[in-house]
Amino acid sequence: EAIEAAKTDFYRLGWVADYPDAENFLNLFHSKYVPAELTTKTYINSFRYKSKIFDQYFDDAVQTVDETKRNELYTKADQQVIDDAVVMPIYYDIDFRLLQPNVRNCPQNAMEQRDFTEVYFVPMKGF
């Protein structure tokens, strides 16, 4: 609540995407989510970051159908956030995968969501 009400100077925040697209993360930095009054709570852009340059890259990316061009624009938007030092990334999740040749039906996806009910192992030769 203190974060949403801009009553803290420093805090840790985590975000997990619910769909695999850069928009899901970069949307957090769009100035359209910054309220006019500092006392008004905001959930999405709790950083209260405003950048016309970022917004333009982001808005253009959202409107772009070409995936390569869209990713280029998202990269520029991301770099703008980095250049403006809006956040300080200090922690990244570590994800695990089962990649042994005897593992079967182990799902791999960018969202790190897995259903292991169909996973099985086949005997390895020589063991």
Predicted feature residues:
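Pocket-flanking alpha-helical
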Residues: 1-34, 81
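Short, solvent-exposed loop/beta-turn-alpha elements that line the ligand-binding surface or hinge
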Residues: 2-6, 27-59, 92-127
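A broadly tuned preference for mixed-charge, low-complexity surface segments
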Residues: 9-25, 61-67, 116-122
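Bilobed periplasmic-binding protein-like "clamshell/Venus-flytrap" ligand-binding domains
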Residues: 11-14, 64-101
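Alpha-helical interaction segments
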Residues: 19, 44-47, 64, 81-82, ...
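Extracytoplasmic/secreted proteins, especially bacterial periplasmic and envelope-associated proteins
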Residues: 21-25, 52-60, 69-76, 80-83
